């Protein structure tokens, strides 16, 4: 209870965000961590901890790891795994970890080499307010309170677009009707990260949404600053790694220019450029290394010169772009690399395409499956399945490297999700195309922009498969070089340009508008005009790519491929579902012996899947026969099943029979039914009447009007 001496009191900082309380608490839980903060938003609660190692590690990068841990008790569920405990993070947890990692990573000081671990644990999820946007807020607050050097704070918000108006932090229910799902993380001065899924939204609306998000996150930043002023620990002392003095770096840069660095950097081929650059670096460093009196180079300084050479390369590449408008492969800022496209490349795949842009190449494939192929989602959401899957594979050979294959990487999960969001907006409704659809993007070559090439290849493969998408989708990766109020926007960036730029963003969409956007900003606040110009330049490139795609395949194919499963649908009365299934599933098993799969939904919808159309048609006929209902006035070819003294029972179709009374068998008086009919005879009969108990009276249509119908008492 509150006030008990043994229970530490939490420090609470609170505000109202989109009509719901946002609370930051610290000082009560996980106190041995360098920084720990509990964040509550309505009934969604996450705990973030920040910890750094006491000593630096030998590395030339920031050793930061971010984990996003989902606890199933947060939604009152027991995990569905065999061990009934949480295992490896699922896709949503990986995406949430990346959403936290990307905006905090650029704010660590350059050269900081202490291991840093951020763990965000979801303790409660109210099924209304998604916990993913709380990850960056909680991680930022924990870092602010810790002794870890970090130039925060940051905050994150989600923006929806409903009825033409922006909605701050829409609930999961509101997102279902929103035209936009935009997550923005930023600092006071700048937007640092953007993730968006959109329903063909125009560029001006996106810029307005970004501005709206940045404005609305400011109170969260102020709340963290207030907490840090009162509670933050002193920052740890750390020593930056040794580097060359600035004057030696400058001398190395001038020497590199004299020896022809610019020409080496403008070698068109990635492989040739890498080899030429490595040889150039070796010669340059050997020349630049200080020599002893005996002429022996100071090998101890070689790592410093190698590190400085990377800075020299980055500086010269940026200079070429800013001052001369030249890029490493000789293109201008707005130029696309050469593109070639193939479709229908695999004989057995349900849809396939190869999209090649410069030295980036992706094989896209589509597989159509049944309802049984849907992915079961065992996460913190409501129990549901997923019918549209997009998977991205990035093997080491695509970059000419050797690397152990250790399963799916976080990067592969993130890129696959980006491609999925790009394509999702144009996918057909389930009632129009009831297949489970899996798109796979296998990267065969990579030199930048492979995720956007996956969007293009995946779209072409969908069209090749005959999936009736609403419009083609293309994607392009953009870059920005920004210096002293000078900005050059680069279209279709190389891997080399991705590393040297100040911002990279990937834009996918149709001719009508944007369907997905991902952005990472490494510099301060960018003017609105630059953001809009970048989006418009991306649109210009996207339209050119769509022109090329539509030249090869103008529209989805009208027919499915021969090996794709066929789906036939029909509706049966709910009360007859049991009849279709049969005792112990007997009837369904009999249908499956035809080589089909049968799915039956609670509303009576029956779907039949088979790669053999004739088998599917036969199964459909059997189900229709099982569930048919006789109608007054309809004529049937029936089979005599029983003879009685008062008439003959005729089977109209499986499960349904009627009585042909003795008075209706022939003109005149009939003494014995057996004189006119025998079991097994097939005759035409017409339904004359169905009583309230469902009993059917039949007549012979050829005798109608010649003998009066029987009257029931």
Swiss-Prot record:
Reactions mediated catalytically: RNA(n+1) + phosphate = RNA(n) + a ribonucleoside 5'-diphosphate
GO terms assigned for molecular function: 3'-5'-RNA exonuclease activity; magnesium ion binding; polyribonucleotide nucleotidyltransferase activity; RNA binding
Keywords, sorted A to Z: Cytoplasm, Magnesium, Metal-binding, Nucleotidyltransferase, RNA-binding, Transferase
Keyword Protease in annotation: no
Primary location class: cytoplasm
Cellular component GO terms, alphabetical: cytosol
Keyword Transmembrane helix: no
Residues covered by the S1 motif domain: 633-701
EC number: 2.7.7.8
Short name of any one Pfam family annotated for the protein: PNPase
Domain KH: 565-631
Positions bound to Mg(2+): 498, 504
Signal peptide, first to last residue: none
Required cofactor(s): Mg(2+)
Compartment list: Cytoplasm
GO biological process: mRNA catabolic process; RNA processing
HAMAP family referenced in this protein's UniProt entry, alphabetically: PNPase (MF_01595)
Functional summary from the UniProt entry: Involved in mRNA degradation. Catalyzes the phosphorolysis of single-stranded polyribonucleotides processively in the 3'- to 5'-direction.
PANTHER family per the UniProt record, alphabetical: POLYRIBONUCLEOTIDE NUCLEOTIDYLTRANSFERASE, POLYRIBONUCLEOTIDE NUCLEOTIDYLTRANSFERASE 1, MITOCHONDRIAL
Similarity comment: family membership: Belongs to the polyribonucleotide nucleotidyltransferase family.
Name of protein: Polyribonucleotide nucleotidyltransferase
Organism from which the protein derives: Thermus thermophilus (strain ATCC BAA-163 / DSM 7039 / HB27)
Gene that produces this protein: pnp
